[in-house]
Amino acid sequence: DIGHGKGSFSFKVAKLMLENNFQPDVISSDVHKLCINGPAFDQLTTLSKFLVLGVPFYDVIEQSTVNAAKALNRPELGTFKVGSVGDVSLLRIDTGSYDYIDVLGETLAGDRKIELDGVVLNGQWWHTA
């Protein structure tokens, strides 16, 4: 579990991990008042960092949803199966010039960023970003 917050997650370690074919089981964030303004910011920024590091979008989403639900022993989450919780985040990948920062202050330039378009909770449209 990545658990990106104020004290864990460096690009150097993440790159070494990925270069050695060691994918994270779970990509999560540990956002709190000391890191909400950086370096973690939010879950989508954490996911974007892995996208820019070369992890395919499908894997990034699976590691943040399906695998996270399994790690929490919550099989009703992280799936679209009939009878499961009807929660969905509608995401898009924006392209441009983005700078990402890790807990050591190192930066990574990227050309993609995952953004939120809307949210469905319990099968009901809840929010448009």
Features from the language model and the residues they span:
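Structural detector of well-ordered beta-strand residues that form the stable sheet scaffold
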Residues: 1-3, 27-28
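Active-site glycine- and acidic-residue-rich loops that bind
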Residues: 2-11, 71
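Short linear motifs at secondary-structure transitions and domain/linker junctions
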Residues: 2-4, 63-67, 92-97, 102
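Hydrophobic alpha-helical scaffolding
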Residues: 3-7, 36, 54, 109
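Basic, gly/Ser/Thr/Pro-rich low-complexity segments located predominantly at protein N termini
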Residues: 8, 35-37, 123, 128
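His/Asp/Glu-enriched, well-ordered alpha-helical/loop segment
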Residues: 12-93
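C-terminal cap of metal-dependent C-N hydrolases
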Residues: 86-129
